[in-house]
């Protein structure tokens, strides 16, 4: 039997360095700060750290606008700081995964600065340029951050494409020289000892070369999972990822199961695994992110069923509730009030019981919440500020917009990590770049470590279960009680064992009936989120946000 790749039974911890730990008084996190917290991460027992971009960047989009792929931004430290962090992590058995953005570069990148204003620059064809159409933009594609996806270069009269901010110019992957540069960048970091790469919005790199107008949407159907995407990924995988033995995870925007079965194929011909976001759109009524609505629980279960069954035996998924672009999960699908701790544990158990590689976003393991900012000036996020202006222009009241941002802004997850009850949550001795959530005196890592019943130790238990029981990695997926409006229950089967996971997603009790085919079997409780959970699988009344994981012998 072939050996399971390390990442299939791993749990990965995502660090947003700007908000993790400041080693001084700058107010922004840095590499030395991460290094100072490695023992905390070792206590949690995660296998790898994914760092969001720490490359040289003007920080228009918090580092996802890279101006130099081969150097560390001075805000985070130096290359020797990075090398020291890598060595210190490896010494603790923790791998490092770097975030790489190759759909676009910053307009401050040397390639773009050479290309701008000069049609004859050797770097002009590194980007996507089009002539005006009818005296205006080349087509009606929209930027993900609002407005047209095209920006005029006045010196040449041509427009360049930017699917994100105008300071993020899209690279032209049709140009073999661009693909060669990407391979060189990956080689550079792999040679330093980096263990893996997270590829930002990687399924957007292949554009329909006709660049047609979109009569029904914002243009995304012409560049999402585009015509040459699989060819491009196989090329990079064959030439660099496979030879250096790197783990790769692709962020897939608005993708499909069929594409992800290929992106994350078990033969590793493209990537190791994929992130998809369908489950985090269940509170976008009519597809509208910028609205405030309860999440659609039945749809959440349906989506996970579709992906768990569809990827089993074909491809590998990354499992996650949170990241630096999403609100805090306990605020979103759980409870910020009296049930916060059990709700955070329930959400963790439900996700970690699934097949795939779980990702924990910094602070998730202590049940951090959205900050509940009351003023637009508290927000730093470019997307949030743009939406505020757009909604105001549409006539929406400030209170309504702030309520929406309070639920959906990317800054909800970017507030400083809450280390202790000390000033600024122990994040910095200076002025933090983003205001910490006001609840840090109660919700912080120091308090969590001291309390054996905290969310932190529940995550630690889940990580230990995944290492101890191969069924977490290997089992298939079958949903139970499909139409139940409160309970998400599923079984996973492998090697004569059955894993039963039962979760109440609401603050009211719910009656759970053990299915007849599972009755009478021997089983043991692996983990509950109340101190007196039933030891054997049985019908029971689930308490608010109660979650139970049982292992049964068939």
What function would you assign to each model-found segment?
Residues 1-554:
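Active-site and adjacent substrate-binding regions of carbohydrate-active enzymes
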